[in-house]
């Protein structure tokens, strides 16, 4: 037998070992212990994270909500009937997110980015935006000073909204809350056409599919769908989908905000969102508190609404923003904004209930709509007394600030006098004039739905009202006067007056012209 050298043996062994694939892949697999009411308890996923997506063998997905001692509580994103006890579940190691693409504009999607409008797949480069994300820190924000025009006279004049603000729309059912938000979206068409778009996200939570279809058709009819994304979790969808819908809207808005653009997100409505979260929490056996809502219901809405912000206009500072998604790095720009219009439904006008008071305390103001005003034909039915914008005149152009400065006080005085005169008695000339002016201003601020006005026309018509130039026009003909007055301005004075008002200029020369035109038109209505 020939001698074998030890070095040869080691060489042979090394060659043999090189061919061995030692990469062992581990997959954490769990089993469904219990499933009911849209919730599954899973055993065996000891390393699962809160908010992580899990996948069943059937392809259905679930999200981890509870981490308990011997199992994890998850909410199902599909039908409960498709998941059974004993089914295998595996971790995806991905936090729940929405694949954002520029091709999403004009589309109707679910909270996870899947199209619902039957127009085929959504095109464009995909960027995963996490649904849950920390709000920008204080150093990455700047004050709200740029106006977001709603096109609604009473709001733009007395309760102005700025880019980056959170303004609550609150009122009973059927008083025009959704109409205000849709009008605001339609009014952004001019910005889109001039190359300074405000991208709009409308989030429908727990609404009927037919209602959402009507909203889509309205936006399409008025040419607003090109810059709008509609996120839908309908009434027939699982509670988990309704719970995640507003977070999906916020994530889409953050994509525009963090790339230096402007976005507006409407949450319609957060009352149904709170109910969906309560349902999920109760089924997960979380401790309940007031009105059976879980203890963190305030935190649910505060962490959602705090994501609305005006970002500092400095690219290098914005690029270091906290909690940025990795796939967004390198595209971040400063100067963007995300404005939020949450909607809350009250019961019999009770704004002191649990969820309304929570959201009022989180937001930067509220627009309160009243059933009595709506039924009296005063639409939008804004109760100016308890409606407020905490940003105020900072979010108005100079001309609007100048004409609307006294309007809120004037209308409050009118309401007070009107209540007093119901007791009867004689009135002096000043009181009669104040009441007459107040009534005509109320009539001037009435506006039909889906008919937003450009800011320059709002300024012109409010100027006429506060200067008392309608004294010779009967109350019932004020709206006719408004139509004729604005038509004359558009046809003959677009450059001299309207374009100047649009730039915020309202000097003595323009005031004299407006006075003269108003007097001429008023003569036709005596």
UniProtKB/Swiss-Prot annotation:
It catalyses: ATP + H2O + 4 H(+)(in) = ADP + phosphate + 5 H(+)(out). It is found in: Cell inner membrane. Its main location: membrane. The keyword Transport applies. It is a peripheral membrane protein. InterPro entries: ATP_synth_asu-like_sf, ATP_synth_asu_C, ATP_synth_asu_C_sf, ATP_synth_F1_a_nt-bd_dom, ATP_synth_F1_asu, ATPase_a/bsu_AS, ATPase_F1/V1/A1_a/bsu_N, ATPase_F1/V1/A1_a/bsu_N_sf. ATP binds at residues 171-178. Its EC number is 7.1.2.2. Keywords: ATP synthesis, ATP-binding, Cell inner membrane, Cell membrane, CF(1), Hydrogen ion transport, Ion transport, Membrane, Nucleotide-binding, Translocase, Transport. One of its GO terms (molecular function) is proton-transporting ATP synthase activity, rotational mechanism. It is an enzyme of class 7 (translocase). The keyword Cell membrane applies. One of its GO terms (cellular component) is proton-transporting ATP synthase complex. The record marks 387 as: Required for activity. It holds the Pfam family ATP-synt_ab_N. F-type ATPases have 2 components, CF(1) - the catalytic core - and CF(0) - the membrane proton channel. CF(1) has five subunits: alpha(3), beta(3), gamma(1), delta(1), epsilon(1). CF(0) has three main subunits: a(1), b(2) and c(9-12). The alpha and beta chains form an alternating ring which encloses part of the gamma chain. CF(1) is attached to CF(0) by a central stalk formed by the gamma and epsilon chains, while a peripheral stalk is formed by the delta and b chains. Produces ATP from ADP in the presence of a proton gradient across the membrane. The alpha chain is a regulatory subunit. PANTHER family: ATP SYNTHASE SUBUNIT ALPHA, MITOCHONDRIAL. Belongs to the ATPase alpha/beta chains family. This is ATP synthase subunit alpha. It comes from Azobacteroides pseudotrichonymphae genomovar. CFP2.
């Amino acid at each position: 037998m020939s001698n074998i050298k030890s070095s040869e043996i080691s060489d042979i062994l090394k060659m043999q070992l090189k061919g061995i694939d030692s990469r062992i892949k581990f997959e954490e697999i769990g089993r469904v212990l219990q499933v009911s009411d849209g919730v599954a308890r899973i055993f065996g996923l000891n390393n699962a994270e809160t908010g992580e997506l899990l996948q069943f063998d059937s392809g259905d997905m679930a999200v981890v909500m509870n981490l308990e001692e011997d199992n994890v509580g998850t909410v199902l994103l599909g039908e409960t009937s498709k998941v059974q006890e004993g089914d295998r579940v595996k971790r995806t190691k991905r936090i729940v997110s929405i694949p954002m693409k520029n091709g999403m504009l004009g589309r109707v999607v679910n909270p996870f980015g899947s199209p619902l409008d039957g127009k085929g797949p959504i095109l464009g480069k995909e960027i995963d935006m996490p649904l849950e994300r920390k709000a920008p820190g204080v150093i990455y924000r700047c004050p709200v000073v740029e106006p977001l025009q709603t096109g609604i006279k009473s709001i733009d004049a007395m309760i102005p909204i700025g880019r980056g603000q959170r303004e609550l729309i609150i009122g009973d059912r059927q008083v025009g809350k959704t109409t205000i938000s849709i009008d605001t979206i339609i009014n952004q068409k001019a910005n889109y056409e001039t190359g300074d778009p405000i991208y709009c996200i409308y989030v429908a939570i727990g609404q009927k599919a037919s209602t959402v279809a009507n909203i889509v058709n309205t936006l399409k009819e008025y040419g607003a769908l090109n810059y709008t994304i509609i996120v839908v979790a309908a009434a027939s969808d699982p509670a988990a989908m309704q719970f995640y819908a507003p977070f999906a809207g916020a994530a889409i808005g953050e994509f525009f905000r963090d790339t230096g653009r402007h976005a507006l997100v409407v949450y319609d409505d957060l009352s149904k969102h709170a109910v969906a979260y309560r349902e999920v929490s109760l089924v997960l056996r979380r401790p309940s508190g007031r009105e059976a809502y879980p203890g963190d219901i305030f935190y649910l809405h505060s962490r959602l609404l705090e994501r609305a912000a005006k970002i500092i206009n400095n690219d290098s500072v914005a690029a270091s923003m906290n909690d940025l998604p990795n796939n967004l790095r390198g595209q971040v720009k400063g100067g963007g904004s995300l404005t939020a219009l949450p909607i809350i439904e009250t019961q019999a006008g009770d704004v002191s209930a649990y969820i309304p008071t929570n959201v009022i305390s989180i937001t930067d103001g509220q627009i309160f709509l009243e059933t009595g005003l709506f039924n009296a034909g005063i639409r939008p039915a804004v109760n100016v007394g308890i409606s407020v914008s905490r940003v105020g005149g900072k979010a108005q152009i100079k001309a609007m600030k100048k004409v609307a400065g006294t309007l809120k006080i004037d209308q409050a005085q009118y309401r007070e006098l009107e209540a007093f005169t119901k007791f009867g008695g004689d009135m002096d000339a000043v009181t009669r004039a104040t009441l007459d002016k107040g009534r005509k201003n109320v009539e001037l601020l009435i506006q039909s739905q889906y008919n937003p006005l450009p800011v320059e026309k709002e300024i012109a018509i409010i100027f006429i009202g506060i200067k008392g130039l309608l004294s010779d026009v009967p109350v019932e003909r004020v709206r006719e006067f408004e139509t004729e007055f604005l038509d004359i301005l558009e046809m003959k004075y677009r450059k001299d007056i309207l374009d100047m008002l649009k730039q915020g200029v309202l000097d003595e020369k323009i005031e004299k012209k407006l006075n003269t035109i108003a007097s001429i038109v008023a003569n036709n209505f005596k």
